[in-house]
Amino acid sequence: LPYPWTQKALDGAPRELPCILKSRTGCGSKAVHVLTEETYHEGTVYHEDDIFQEWIAGEEEEYTCGLFRSASGEIRTMILRRKLRGGLTGCGTVEENPAIEALLTSLAKVLELRGSINVQLRLRDGVPYVFEINPRFSSTVRFRHQLGFSDVVWSMQDSVGHGIAAYIPPPKGIHFYKIYEDVIDWKRTNI
């Protein structure tokens, strides 16, 4: 499993710069910083959960992947190339990538996964590098569900011993967008 070097920030200076500074317990990609020679300062006080991680260049090659494995061992995947907005996936495209697919399948087997996880990675020279695994339903769960990857439903069906509903992967190239709405409450006039 290719992955970027990662170390606790409290263990000393990062192995190399540039690198990423983030919390192990973050939410989305909020409070993620790229440290460079100019922005890294020795003696900075870090928190217990802060980590340094190898920076993998190429925001245009960032993916978020849904990975589901049933109790019977059936593996289902969805690969989404994404662009971040405000620390969360703002838009993206359904992709097919044999190297990523092989990595996800291997990961599901090695972890003896039952249920769903979210795997985030970047490609470097065509090789997928996993930089984060979220053992939960991620912020892309609604996108995935609308595209037919119903891992929440499958997880519930599987946990009570029902057969899981069929999955027809969406075609490569479908685009998705997160849209925020402005709402005006004309009934509430006293603030």
Where are these regions (language model features)?
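A conserved helix-loop-beta module that forms one wall/lid of the active-site cleft
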Residues: 1-33
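Residue-level signal for secondary-structure boundary sites
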Residues: 29, 73, 139-141
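Broad gene-expression machinery/nucleic-acid interaction feature
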Residues: 16-18, 62-64, 116-118
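Phosphate-binding site of ATP-dependent enzymes
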Residues: 32-112, 122-123, 127-129
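A generic fold-level signal
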Residues: 13-15, 27, 47, 60, ...
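ATP-dependent carboxylate activation and anion-phosphoryl transfer catalytic cores
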Residues: 95-191
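A short, flexible beta-alpha/helix-coil linker loop
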Residues: 26-27, 84-88, 136-139
